[in-house]
């Protein structure tokens, strides 16, 4: 409670200082100044006691030619037990002593930080803001106000300072929601993710336990900080190590600063593109910033629906060369949404479970928030489907929580939390829990960008009340019940879909369902029907022959550089065209009465006899061109079936259809089917799979297709495996439409209201 009062007091004070920026800055831009200054003031207070001694030691080391800058930094940090230091002559107080040179001195003060601190602080690009404040004649006023805040660690402990900073980051980001939404996850969503991640995990209570947490898209570090707080609240003696990677400079600076001002290690937060581009440069990590590292817990909010074209070549190369020895073995999603690449990346960093050859109690848990696309986008055999298949068949998908819409600052779409783990509890093995949290929403008093709803968090900071949706959803996850229902009154929501009609509080909604892993898999079978054609030689069909590629290509020369040879080839082709047309014209009278030949073999004999002895002859290409559908042949359901050389029916591509058939109820997972990749050139042996599923598919055909299309058959060579999670379909419940009398009465009521309003105008 003492920490909470302290952080509220200081946070409000800093928030009020931001009003000094009004004019040169718009409110959404205040964070550009106030967040870096808060960090600098905390660092200034932390270094105050050792400042003089550090300066003396630094000067002494610089006088020696034996030490380079890296060695000097190591000596000073070790000697004074510091993670960073500052070698400038200035502090916040002494900066104010020279108002005329404040801007220049502040820049020198920033340059005086040791390299590890500068790596973070430089990403704020604060020099631009110093110049802007100086030009607006606000710099002295702002620095004076910030210098008056006492953030000394003796009076503001690290934990309280963490609360202050996180609160400021949240408030400034909410104020700048239009700009910050891409990399700022709402606090209550993070809390729910953390709760679900650690729900039922006994290892977090082990004294002295080393727990490694990772976020590959860590943004401002909210998920890492919330995870650490959750663990330390339950187990103060736990040893938590935080790892992250971020490519937005300001977000990286905020995340690193959060750790720095709490006295924690910052070198495990790296700056760079997690997926990788293959175009690395100094100071930027290109690709995996923590190679060969594994983590116990991982969280992420990858960008929604953002294309990964800049990373395409690098990622595709890794997929093709390394397969499952790299990060992206299961497949690549379509270029317009790379979210599933991040999940594959996280799974590559899992701690092996005991079943995977790891230590007893090993394994990892992942919480990641996606939009709806990763649930179902991608047909059978596509990259997205194969990634889902890989995860589900390995029994790693534990739960999916469908959140309310309008929770995020920069999008109103519905979002979903995936819980993925290679150490499921015994009761969850082979199962996936879907949780419908769509009604667990609390309407906000004031919208923040697209965010109009939030998850209720219980008692609020200002003493108000919200239902505790986070705890309720955590319990639903822990209860692990099938077909669990709750009354609207028990959910406690103030969202009314219909403004004129209150929700029935006694109505129950489905909130939890359990599924077997195989329930999400299906076989995409290709259903063929035979090619049936009638044939005739008529003017219209001859015109179709003339428009065909075989006929037109006869008069096109391939000898482009040999003009003489080209002309001769074209002339020869035109002669062949004329000969074909002449022969067909000779056959026309036979069909003047509308006669049709409904057997292809019979018609072929007729044509073969007509072309016998001609210059062009009866070649295979000519045969194919003339007998094709859309040439002399036309589709006819009454015609005989066209057979191939082996006597098998030929399929009609225009009648081809596909059916998605659920997997057999008793089929073991994983399926005996390799993933298509560069090594097997997309060709995989399906024989074992077909042996297990052939009769199941034939039974489906007999039940669902043959009663309507008796000549249909399955082309098993085209069979593909798909996986999808049709979340909304599983929670859809039919509601009968309102009685017509009720609708009519409402229309009449609205008409009366409109007439009353019009009468007031007139």
Residues covered by each model-derived region:
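Short, contiguous acidic/charged loop-to-helix segments that flank catalytic cores in large enzymes
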Residues: 24, 309-318, 323-337, 373-383, ...
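Non-catalytic, mostly N-terminal accessory regions of nucleic-acid modification and defense proteins
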Residues: 1-201, 270, 274-277, 402-405, ...
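Conserved Class I SAM-dependent methyltransferase catalytic core
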Residues: 20, 26-42, 329-420, 747
């Amino acid at each position: 409670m003492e920490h909470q009062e302290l952080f509220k007091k200081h946070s409000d004070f800093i928030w009020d200082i931001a009003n000094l920026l009004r004019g040169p800055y718009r409110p959404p831009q205040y964070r550009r100044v106030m967040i870096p200054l808060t960090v600098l003031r905390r660092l200034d207070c932390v270094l105050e006691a050792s400042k003089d001694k550090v300066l003396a030691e630094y000067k002494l080391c610089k006088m020696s030619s034996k030490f380079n800058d890296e060695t000097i930094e190591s000596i000073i940090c070790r000697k004074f037990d510091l993670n960073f230091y500052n070698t400038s002559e200035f502090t916040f107080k002494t900066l104010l002593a020279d108002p005329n040179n404040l801007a220049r001195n502040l820049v020198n003060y920033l340059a005086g930080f040791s390299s590890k601190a500068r790596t973070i602080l430089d990403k704020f690009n604060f020099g631009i803001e110093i110049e802007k404040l100086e030009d607006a004649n606000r710099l002295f006023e702002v620095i004076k106000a910030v210098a008056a805040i006492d953030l000394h660690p003796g009076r503001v402990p690290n934990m309280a300072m963490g609360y202050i900073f996180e609160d400021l980051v949240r408030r400034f980001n909410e104020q700048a929601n239009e700009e910050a939404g891409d990399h700022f996850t709402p606090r209550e969503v993070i809390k729910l993710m953390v709760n679900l991640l650690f729900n039922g995990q006994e290892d977090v209570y082990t004294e002295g336990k080393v727990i490694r947490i990772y976020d590959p898209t860590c943004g401002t570090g909210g998920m890492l900080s919330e995870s650490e707080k959750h663990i330390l609240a339950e187990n103060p003696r736990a040893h938590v190590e935080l790892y992250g990677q971020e490519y937005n400079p300001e977000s990286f600076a905020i995340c690193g600063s959060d750790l720095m001002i709490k006295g924690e290690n910052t070198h495990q937060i790296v700056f760079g593109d997690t997926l990788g581009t293959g175009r690395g440069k100094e100071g930027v990590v290109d690709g995996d910033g923590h190679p060969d590292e594994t983590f116990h817990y991982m969280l992420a909010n990858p960008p929604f629906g953002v294309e990964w074209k800049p990373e395409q070549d690098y990622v595709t190369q890794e997929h093709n060369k390394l397969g499952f020895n790299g990060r992206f073995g299961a497949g690549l999603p379509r270029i317009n949404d790379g979210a599933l690449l991040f999940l594959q990346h996280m799974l590559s960093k899992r701690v092996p479970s005991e079943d995977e050859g790891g230590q007893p109690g090993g394994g990892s848990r992942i919480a990641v928030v996606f939009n709806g696309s990763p649930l179902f986008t991608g047909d059978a055999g596509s990259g997205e489907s194969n990634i889902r298949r890989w995860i589900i068949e390995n029994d790693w998908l534990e739960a999916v929580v469908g959140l309310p819409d309008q929770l995020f600052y920069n999008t109103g779409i519905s979002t979903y939390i995936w819980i993925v783990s290679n150490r499921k509890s015994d009761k969850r093995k082979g199962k996936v829990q879907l949780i419908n949290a769509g009604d667990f929403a609390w309407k906000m008093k004031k919208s923040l960008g697209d965010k109009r709803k939030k998850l209720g968090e219980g008692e609020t900071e200002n003493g108000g009340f919200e239902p505790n949706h986070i705890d309720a959803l955590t319990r639903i996850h822990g209860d692990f019940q099938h077909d669990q229902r709750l009354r609207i009154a028990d959910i406690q929501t103030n969202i009314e879909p219909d403004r004129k009609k209150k929700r029935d509080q006694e109505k129950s909604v489905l909130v939890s369902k359990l599924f077997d892993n195989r329930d999400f898999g299906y076989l995409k079978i290709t259903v063929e029907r035979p090619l049936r054609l009638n044939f005739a030689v008529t003017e219209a069909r001859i015109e179709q022959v003339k428009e065909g590629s075989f006929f037109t290509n006869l008069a096109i020369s391939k000898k482009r550089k040999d003009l003489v040879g080209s002309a001769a080839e074209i002339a020869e082709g035109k002669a062949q065209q004329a000969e074909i047309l002449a022969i067909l014209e000779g056959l026309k009278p036979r069909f003047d009465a509308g006669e049709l030949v409904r057997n292809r073999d019979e018609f072929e004999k007729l044509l073969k006899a007509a072309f016998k002895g001609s210059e062009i002859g009866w070649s295979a290409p000519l045969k194919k061109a003339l007998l094709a559908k859309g040439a002399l042949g036309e589709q006819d359901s009454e015609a005989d079936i066209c057979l191939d050389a082996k006597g098998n029916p030929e399929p009609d591509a225009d009648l081809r259809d596909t059916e998605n058939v659920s997997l057999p109820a008793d089929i073991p997972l994983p399926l005996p089917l390799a993933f298509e990749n560069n090594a097997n050139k997309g060709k995989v042996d399906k024989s074992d799979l077909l042996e297990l599923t052939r009769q199941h598919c034939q039974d489906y055909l007999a039940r669902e297709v043959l009663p309507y299309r008796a000549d249909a058959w399955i082309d098993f060579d085209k069979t593909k495996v798909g996986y999808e999670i049709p979340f909304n379909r599983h929670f859809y419940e039919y509601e009968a439409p309102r009685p017509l009398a009720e609708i009519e009465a409402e229309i009449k009521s609205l008409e009366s209201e409109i007439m009353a309003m019009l009468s007031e105008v007139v």
